[in-house]
Structure formats: structure tokens, C-alpha cells
A protein has these predicted regions:
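Surface-exposed, low-hydrophobicity beta-strand/loop segments enriched in small/polar/acidic residues
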Residues: 1-131
Length: 131
């Protein structure tokens, strides 16, 4: 199966780890997302490799990628599979009024996550606010 991913290069404003969720800052650079960004439309995508401040890194802005996850009890729960920004560049289950930016892609070996685990997600950006 072929996947169409959209990946672009951006300059980092600060240190970014591989598979961090990132956002635009006021200078047009990218920075790691935090939990406060769950209600922000500035979320851009998922860093495809780590970098230091001032370096360039590739960011997946639409498509399938690995991502850092928070503790998600059960991927099969419809509310838990819709993801938003969480602490330290992670994705976690979206709450009401959060921008849903991705959905988890579970498989037989991956049905839940502990805090800091990596998982496969479909990232589509901040287009829907969870009601």
C-alpha cells in the first residue's frame, strides 16, 4: 500500500526530539508542543528527526508517522483514538474544545500506550475541535 505523506523542512527555534509534535513560533521557526497547545491552531506536524536550535529538520505535516504518545488506556475507545497536543511534544487523547490533530493507528501488537511510548498515527493537523 502506497502512502502519500507531505513532509517539509523547517528551522528549529529550540531542541526538538525525533517524533515530537511541533508548532510554529512567532519567528516562523518550529518548537516542541506542550499541553497548552491542545487548543492552538499553530500545531504544524511531527518532527521526523531530532535537531538542535538553529538546525533544519523535516516535519510531516500530513500523513502517517510514528509519534510520541501519552498514557492511552485503550486505542479502541472512540474518544481515546482522537489525539491532541500533550506535554513534552507528545500526543494524547483529546478532550472537549481541543483541536484533534491525529488519530491512532492501532494493530494487533499495539492497543494501548504507556506515557512516552511511540505509536503509529495518521496526522492531519488542527482542523476539528472536539465537541
Amino acid at each position: 500500500m502506497q502512502t502519500q505523506n507531505i513532509v517539509k523542512s523547517y528551522v528549529a527555534a529550540s531542541t526538538i526530539a525525533e517524533f515530537d509534535l511541533v508548532k510554529f513560533d512567532a519567528n516562523g521557526k518550529i518548537a516542541q508542543c506542550g499541553a497548552a497547545d491542545a487548543t492552538s491552531a499553530l500545531i504544524l506536524g511531527i518532527a521526523q528527526r531530532g535537531c538542535a536550535a538553529g538546525e533544519v529538520t523535516d516535519v510531516l505535516i500530513q500523513g502517517v508517522s510514528r509519534a510520541k504518545l501519552g498514557a492511552i488506556a485503550a486505542f479502541e475507545n472512540s474518544g481515546d483514538c482522537l489525539l491532541t497536543a500533550a506535554a513534552s511534544g507528545k500526543l494524547d487523547s483529546a478532550a472537549s474544545t481541543n483541536f484533534v490533530v491525529a488519530r491512532i493507528l492501532p494493530n494487533i501488537n499495539s492497543t494501548a500506550s504507556a506515557d512516552g511510548d511511540q505509536g503509529e498515527v495518521l496526522f492531519f493537523g488542527p482542523v476539528v475541535v472536539k465537541a
